[in-house]
Amino acid sequence: MTDYLLLFVGTVLVNNFVLVKFLGLCPFMGVSKKLESAIGMGMATTFVMTLATIFSWIIDHLILVPLELVYLRTMAFILVIAVVVQFTEMVVRKTSPALYRLLGIYLPLITTNCAVLGVALLSINLNHTFMQSALYGFSAAVGFSLVMVLFAAIRERLVVADVPLPFRGNAIALVTAGLMSLAFMGFSGLVKF
Protein backbone atom coordinates (compact mmCIF):
# COMPACT_ATOMS: atom_id res chain seq x y z
CA MET A 1 0.00 0.00 0.00
CA THR A 2 2.87 2.35 0.80
CA ASP A 3 4.34 1.70 -2.65
CA TYR A 4 1.13 2.88 -4.28
CA LEU A 5 1.03 6.01 -2.14
CA LEU A 6 4.66 6.79 -3.00
CA LEU A 7 3.94 6.19 -6.69
CA PHE A 8 0.96 8.56 -6.52
CA VAL A 9 2.77 11.35 -4.67
CA GLY A 10 5.92 10.89 -6.74
CA THR A 11 4.06 11.11 -10.03
CA VAL A 12 1.78 14.03 -9.07
CA LEU A 13 4.30 16.26 -7.32
CA VAL A 14 7.90 15.12 -7.73
CA ASN A 15 7.91 13.91 -11.35
CA ASN A 16 5.12 16.09 -12.71
CA PHE A 17 4.83 15.57 -16.45
CA VAL A 18 4.32 19.25 -17.27
CA LEU A 19 6.73 20.99 -14.93
CA VAL A 20 9.49 18.37 -14.63
CA LYS A 21 9.34 16.28 -17.81
CA PHE A 22 7.98 19.14 -19.98
CA LEU A 23 5.35 16.97 -21.67
CA GLY A 24 1.94 18.35 -22.58
CA LEU A 25 3.00 21.98 -22.86
CA CYS A 26 0.68 22.73 -25.81
CA PRO A 27 -2.58 22.24 -23.86
CA PHE A 28 -0.91 23.63 -20.75
CA MET A 29 -0.33 26.98 -22.46
CA GLY A 30 -3.33 26.91 -24.79
CA VAL A 31 -6.22 25.96 -22.53
CA SER A 32 -5.09 27.66 -19.34
CA LYS A 33 -6.41 31.14 -20.12
CA LYS A 34 -9.73 30.46 -18.38
CA LEU A 35 -10.24 28.39 -15.26
CA GLU A 36 -13.39 26.68 -16.58
CA SER A 37 -11.69 25.42 -19.72
CA ALA A 38 -8.65 24.28 -17.71
CA ILE A 39 -10.87 22.28 -15.36
CA GLY A 40 -12.73 20.72 -18.29
CA MET A 41 -9.52 19.92 -20.15
CA GLY A 42 -8.05 18.49 -16.95
CA MET A 43 -11.03 16.20 -16.46
CA ALA A 44 -11.01 15.07 -20.09
CA THR A 45 -7.25 14.48 -20.01
CA THR A 46 -7.53 12.58 -16.73
CA PHE A 47 -10.14 10.29 -18.24
CA VAL A 48 -8.20 9.77 -21.47
CA MET A 49 -4.77 9.37 -19.86
CA THR A 50 -5.99 6.83 -17.30
CA LEU A 51 -7.88 4.71 -19.82
CA ALA A 52 -5.14 4.97 -22.45
CA THR A 53 -2.51 3.80 -19.97
CA ILE A 54 -4.67 0.86 -18.87
CA PHE A 55 -5.53 -0.23 -22.42
CA SER A 56 -1.94 0.27 -23.57
CA TRP A 57 -0.70 -2.01 -20.78
CA ILE A 58 -3.29 -4.64 -21.71
CA ILE A 59 -2.46 -4.51 -25.42
CA ASP A 60 1.27 -4.59 -24.72
CA HIS A 61 1.12 -7.57 -22.35
CA LEU A 62 -1.56 -9.60 -24.15
CA ILE A 63 -0.75 -8.91 -27.80
CA LEU A 64 2.53 -7.13 -28.51
CA VAL A 65 4.90 -8.97 -26.17
CA PRO A 66 3.54 -12.51 -26.74
CA LEU A 67 3.60 -12.03 -30.52
CA GLU A 68 7.00 -10.29 -30.37
CA LEU A 69 5.59 -7.14 -31.94
CA VAL A 70 7.05 -4.67 -29.44
CA TYR A 71 8.41 -2.55 -32.30
CA LEU A 72 4.77 -1.58 -32.98
CA ARG A 73 4.30 -0.17 -29.47
CA THR A 74 4.23 3.50 -30.40
CA MET A 75 1.84 3.00 -33.30
CA ALA A 76 -0.44 0.75 -31.25
CA PHE A 77 -0.50 3.19 -28.34
CA ILE A 78 -1.33 6.12 -30.64
CA LEU A 79 -4.22 4.08 -32.02
CA VAL A 80 -5.43 3.29 -28.48
CA ILE A 81 -5.22 6.97 -27.54
CA ALA A 82 -7.16 7.99 -30.66
CA VAL A 83 -9.95 5.52 -29.87
CA VAL A 84 -10.17 6.65 -26.24
CA VAL A 85 -10.23 10.33 -27.31
CA GLN A 86 -13.05 9.67 -29.78
CA PHE A 87 -15.01 7.88 -27.05
CA THR A 88 -14.38 10.78 -24.66
CA GLU A 89 -15.46 13.30 -27.29
CA MET A 90 -18.75 11.45 -27.80
CA VAL A 91 -19.37 11.28 -24.03
CA VAL A 92 -18.58 14.98 -23.48
CA ARG A 93 -20.76 16.01 -26.45
CA LYS A 94 -23.73 14.07 -25.03
CA THR A 95 -23.30 14.95 -21.34
CA SER A 96 -22.06 18.54 -21.48
CA PRO A 97 -22.53 20.46 -24.74
CA ALA A 98 -21.29 23.65 -23.08
CA LEU A 99 -18.02 21.97 -22.08
CA TYR A 100 -17.76 20.48 -25.55
CA ARG A 101 -18.02 23.96 -27.12
CA LEU A 102 -15.63 25.39 -24.51
CA LEU A 103 -12.92 22.82 -25.22
CA GLY A 104 -13.35 23.25 -28.97
CA ILE A 105 -10.27 22.15 -30.89
CA TYR A 106 -8.38 21.08 -27.77
CA LEU A 107 -10.40 17.91 -27.24
CA PRO A 108 -9.25 16.25 -30.49
CA LEU A 109 -5.74 17.57 -29.75
CA ILE A 110 -5.57 15.23 -26.74
CA THR A 111 -4.80 12.57 -29.36
CA THR A 112 -1.52 14.32 -30.15
CA ASN A 113 -0.79 15.34 -26.56
CA CYS A 114 2.69 13.98 -25.98
CA ALA A 115 1.98 13.60 -22.25
CA VAL A 116 -0.67 10.94 -22.90
CA LEU A 117 1.64 8.91 -25.13
CA GLY A 118 4.59 9.56 -22.81
CA VAL A 119 2.74 8.20 -19.78
CA ALA A 120 1.73 5.04 -21.64
CA LEU A 121 5.27 4.43 -22.91
CA LEU A 122 6.94 5.23 -19.60
CA SER A 123 4.57 2.96 -17.74
CA ILE A 124 5.61 0.06 -19.97
CA ASN A 125 9.32 0.97 -19.82
CA LEU A 126 9.21 1.13 -16.01
CA ASN A 127 7.86 -2.46 -15.94
CA HIS A 128 4.82 -1.57 -13.88
CA THR A 129 2.24 -4.17 -12.95
CA PHE A 130 -1.35 -3.63 -14.09
CA MET A 131 -2.34 -1.83 -10.88
CA GLN A 132 0.83 0.26 -10.86
CA SER A 133 0.26 1.17 -14.50
CA ALA A 134 -3.35 2.23 -13.85
CA LEU A 135 -2.28 4.27 -10.82
CA TYR A 136 0.63 5.79 -12.76
CA GLY A 137 -1.71 6.91 -15.55
CA PHE A 138 -4.21 8.34 -13.08
CA SER A 139 -1.49 10.04 -11.01
CA ALA A 140 0.12 11.61 -14.06
CA ALA A 141 -3.28 12.90 -15.14
CA VAL A 142 -4.01 14.30 -11.67
CA GLY A 143 -0.64 16.06 -11.72
CA PHE A 144 -1.35 17.44 -15.19
CA SER A 145 -4.80 18.66 -14.10
CA LEU A 146 -3.49 20.15 -10.86
CA VAL A 147 -0.84 22.17 -12.65
CA MET A 148 -3.27 23.30 -15.37
CA VAL A 149 -5.87 24.49 -12.87
CA LEU A 150 -3.28 26.30 -10.74
CA PHE A 151 -1.76 27.91 -13.82
CA ALA A 152 -5.18 28.97 -15.15
CA ALA A 153 -6.08 30.55 -11.80
CA ILE A 154 -2.80 32.48 -11.79
CA ARG A 155 -3.28 33.58 -15.42
CA GLU A 156 -6.77 34.89 -14.65
CA ARG A 157 -5.30 37.02 -11.89
CA LEU A 158 -2.52 38.22 -14.18
CA VAL A 159 -5.10 39.63 -16.61
CA VAL A 160 -6.16 42.24 -14.05
CA ALA A 161 -2.65 42.73 -12.63
CA ASP A 162 -0.46 45.68 -13.53
CA VAL A 163 2.03 43.79 -15.71
CA PRO A 164 4.61 45.85 -17.65
CA LEU A 165 3.77 46.10 -21.34
CA PRO A 166 6.66 43.92 -22.65
CA PHE A 167 5.65 41.09 -20.30
CA ARG A 168 1.93 40.99 -21.08
CA GLY A 169 0.42 37.89 -22.64
CA ASN A 170 2.55 34.84 -23.29
CA ALA A 171 5.73 36.37 -21.84
CA ILE A 172 4.36 36.61 -18.30
CA ALA A 173 2.71 33.20 -18.77
CA LEU A 174 6.10 31.62 -19.53
CA VAL A 175 7.71 33.38 -16.56
CA THR A 176 4.88 32.13 -14.35
CA ALA A 177 5.27 28.58 -15.67
CA GLY A 178 8.99 28.75 -14.89
CA LEU A 179 8.29 29.92 -11.34
CA MET A 180 5.77 27.12 -10.90
CA SER A 181 8.38 24.64 -12.10
CA LEU A 182 10.83 25.99 -9.53
CA ALA A 183 8.18 25.69 -6.84
CA PHE A 184 7.54 22.05 -7.76
CA MET A 185 11.29 21.38 -7.56
CA GLY A 186 10.84 21.84 -3.82
CA PHE A 187 9.05 18.48 -3.77
CA SER A 188 12.11 16.68 -5.19
CA GLY A 189 13.30 15.42 -1.81
CA LEU A 190 9.84 14.23 -0.80
CA VAL A 191 9.95 10.84 -2.54
CA LYS A 192 13.00 8.94 -3.74
CA PHE A 193 12.67 6.33 -6.47
From Swiss-Prot:
One Pfam family recorded for the sequence: Rnf-Nqr
Which processes are annotated in GO (biological process)? electron transport chain
Q: Which UniProt keywords apply?
A: Cell inner membrane, Cell membrane, Electron transport, Membrane, Translocase, Transmembrane, Transmembrane helix, Transport
Its main localization is membrane
Q: Where is this protein found?
A: Cell inner membrane
Membrane topology note: Multi-pass membrane protein
Query: What general EC class does the enzyme of this chain belong to?
Result: translocase
Q: EC?
A: 7.-.-.-
User: Does Transmembrane appear among the keywords?
Assistant: yes
A GO cellular component term found in this entry reads: plasma membrane
Q: Which InterPro entries match?
A: Ion_transpt_RnfA/RsxA (IPR011293), NqrDE/RnfAE (IPR003667), NqrDE/RnfAE_oxidrdctase (IPR050133)
Bilayer-spanning residue ranges:
5-25, 47-67, 72-92, 102-122, 134-154, 171-191
Q: What family, per the record?
A: Belongs to the NqrDE/RnfAE family.
What assembly does the database describe for this protein?
The complex is composed of six subunits: RnfA, RnfB, RnfC, RnfD, RnfE and RnfG.
Its annotated function is as follows: Part of a membrane-bound complex that couples electron transfer with translocation of ions across the membrane.
Q: Tell me the protein's name.
A: Ion-translocating oxidoreductase complex subunit A
Q: Which organism is it from?
A: Cronobacter sakazakii (strain ATCC BAA-894)
Name of the gene this protein is made from: rnfA
